Amino acid sequence: MLGWVRKRFCSDLAIDLGTTSTQIGLPGEGIRIDEPSVVAVPRGSHRVVGRGAAVGKLAYQMLGRTPEGITAVRPLRHGVISDFELCETMLRYFIRKACGQTMGLRPRVIIAVPGCITPVERRAVFNSAERAGAGRVWLIEESKAAGIGAGLPVSEPLASMICDIGGGTTEVAVLSLADIVASQSIRTAGDTMDDAIVRYLRRRYSLRIGEQTAEQLKIAIGSAAPLDHELTHEVSGLDTASGIPRK
């Protein structure tokens, strides 16, 4: 009876709380929320603009182009919480959006976290989730969650290796018998690549671009392995000397 009530009035949630994006999955349904980990606030304030709605996709559209007095903030850096209050606000928004009209009881939540975070940083994630409306909270290392999600035989007496490149951290691990045999986590990942692209275009072509443009460029022509021929992609930005838009 209690199980029926729980399924009727709230959901068990699996959350990938990432530096770049946050995903929330539901049992038997898959991914329900997949939005950027961004919040738009007035400068010097933690009050979310748009009556609390400038979170995720809406806030991401403001990155690098916010009007004067408003800033788009990422509450996480390198896989850990950098702004506890804004992270709590963002999580509460996403949890309520994921549960929709069925949110009555506080949902049970499991959150994927980088293997490199400290006990203090783990506690910050735990507390942030509880304050955002979660009931019971569990944490799981991202590499293990990624292995399970990729369908690797992580419970068998075999060695499976996985490399998970996120926005703030890169996780490499060997999984076997439902546990992590060896792992390495570094705070260099997708955001580092985006920053390198921004700096390169400014130095080489005197062109200033934003985070979104750098990410789009990375996705369009980036490759994890050498290609037979180089890819090209036209990009628009502002001339660093004149401030005039150009390509």
Question: Where is each model-derived feature located?
Answer:
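Nucleotide/phosphate-binding catalytic cleft detector across ATP-hydrolyzing
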Residues: 1-165, 173-247
